[in-house]
């Protein structure tokens, strides 16, 4: 543990040297271990029960399946799992935090990375190196700001009116079709498969800075995010 705390000698390139790798569930069969958990206790048994319930939901053609995401799991390496759920028609809609969709998925679709770090790292040194920390995961603040600027540029090109987060994220998906550096992002996969993504707190992420910059450049003709209309769309699904 002391070694983890004593990282102040590392420079930025050293701190951002070990990428987070997203797990690929298509490369192994986890059914046996999940099934065996049904005879265990605590969270293990609940995980097996959840898998059984999910299987029943998939069999029920009248069941609408929402995938709900928290930002931390996305940064931790689960984005390909979520992408594959969309790819294989296992979800009907997604409700996520702005951090999951913009700071993690869109961020990586632009070619940027998340890096393995340490929760014991001196945050003062990280600040000096313009590195943001998500528990034990790092991202480059310069790259995050570039991501925000692109969000603003996408907004600049849209008709100035109100949009739900679903509509705006759909425009992001359209942008990625021709501009992504990393193919197969969740946003792009959802765009290709017509799976709506909702971010009820869209601006509760760095994407908010991008939209602020957009409104500063276009004080009289800018887009807005309509949370009330979005709520109605969600209830109609």
Please provide the spans of the model-predicted regions.
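Conserved catalytic alpha/beta core of Sir2/sirtuin-type deacylases, generalized to analogous enzyme cores
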Residues: 2-69, 74-237
């Amino acid at each position: 543990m002391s070694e983890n705390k004593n990282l102040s000698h590392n420079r930025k390139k050293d701190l951002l040297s070990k990428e987070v790798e997203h797990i690929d569930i298509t490369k192994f069969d986890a059914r046996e271990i999940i099934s065996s958990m049904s005879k265990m206790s605590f969270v293990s048994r609940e995980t097996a029960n959840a898998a059984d319930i999910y299987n029943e939901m998939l069999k029920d053609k009248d069941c609408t399946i929402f995938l709900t995401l928290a930002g931390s799991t996305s940064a931790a390496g689960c984005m390909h799992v979520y992408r594959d759920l969309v790819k294989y028609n296992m979800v009907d809609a997604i409700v996520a935090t702005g951090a999951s969709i913009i700071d993690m998925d869109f961020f990586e679709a632009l070619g940027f990375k998340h890096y393995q770090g340490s929760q014991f790292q001196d945050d003062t040194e990280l600040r000096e190196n313009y590195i943001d920390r998500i528990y034990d995961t790092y991202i480059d603040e310069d790259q995050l700001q570039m991501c925000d600027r692109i969000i603003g540029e996408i907004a600049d090109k849209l008709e100035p009116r109100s949009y739900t987060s679903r509509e705006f994220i759909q425009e992001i998906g359209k942008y990625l079709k021709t501009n992504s550096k990393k193919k197969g992002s969740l946003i792009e996969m959802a765009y290709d498969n017509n799976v709506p993504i909702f971010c009820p707190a869209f601006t509760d992420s760095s994407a908010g800075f991008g939209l602020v910059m957009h409104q500063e450049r276009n004080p009289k003709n800018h887009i807005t995010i309509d949370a009330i209309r979005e709520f109605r769309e969600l209830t109609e699904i």
